[in-house]
Amino acid sequence: MNNKLYGNLIFELSHEGRKGYSLPENTFGNYELPLCARRKTDAELPQCDELTVVRHYTNHSENNFGVNNGFYPLGSCTMKYNPIVNEETASMPGFAALHPLQPAETCQGALEAYYNMQKALSDITGLSEFTLNPFAGAHGELTGLMIIRTYHQHNADHKRTKVLVPDSAHGTNPASAAVCGLEVVEVKSTPDGLVDVDDLKTHLDDTIAAMMMTNPNTLGLFESDIPEIARLVHECGALMYYDGANLNPMLGACRPGDMGFDVMHINLHKTFSTPHGGGGPGSGPVGVGKGLEQFLPRPRVVKDGSEYKMDTEYAGISVGEFLGNFATMLRAYTYILSLGKENLPMVGPLATLNANYIKESLKDAYELPITGVCKHEFV
């Protein structure tokens, strides 16, 4: 509750001379700060006693709304389940107290978790290697497109400057392509909401760098022609990009790598239970198929015998400082371990079952433009 006693701002409760701190005995001696490091005026900090500070922030904390006290509606493809055990792992002192500049030999446990997460995502998706460096899903998407662009430039195939994007794609797909300096070419959908393969064929030539797809697509439909689509795109020399926003219903059913995709990003909040929105920060790991590993951004964690090290080869390939949002990765890794290989494959079927139950419950009250079985979401 809000009340006048504890105010809306801690500054409103400030009184000259009140303090709620005590410092330990000075055992280091007194040292004069150089003039360049001294403030010219006192810092404008509130002066409050301990009880006032505790009660003020406790009072405001009761106004918070989140997944622990109510339904937190975000995008339909975003998980609404953020297990508390994930937070316990991420806040363990052995992880939370680390400094990103620590020598690798002093944080082997953290690097082992990071390395194991890379391998877990490879197993789940069927792709060769992963980087966990991108700081969000859209950041991962842009990183994936930059990998594709670099791959073609490495092969001196500079004319490939176009990206095929279905008209049912997520809005981030054309946006990421444009930011990457690539031209977007729209591919039409059939009346059933799937990619029109005949229309796709009219766009395929030696200027195409990649095709971006979400499978299932934004309508919640599985693209059943994906083997044919992948074959056609590869035959023209382009790569297949998988937008992992809708990966959740695929767990236990099929893997993007097995469908013919070469590059993908994963939204950890959409598939592996990490917080989203105000509960962030995000994380957008990027995976690549065989032959593309050298284009992944650095640094990466590698295993040398029984030791974990930082791979800084091709150090110029970077998408941000250090190793991404480490604590977010820990939350997702905890979720994967808590389910294990036996239960993780049940995520997809259960997500599909839940969505179809809701769809059938609403069909008499809402118009359904697309009929039939959906995956994890529907329109």
Name each model-derived stretch.
Residues 73-82, 134-140, 166-169, 246-252, ...:
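A glycine-rich phosphate-binding loop feature that marks nucleotide/adenosyl-phosphate handling sites
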Residues 263-376:
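Active-site C-terminal subdomain of aminotransferase-like
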Residues 110-122, 170-174, 196-204, 229, ...:
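Structured alpha-helical segments in the cores of large, soluble enzyme domains
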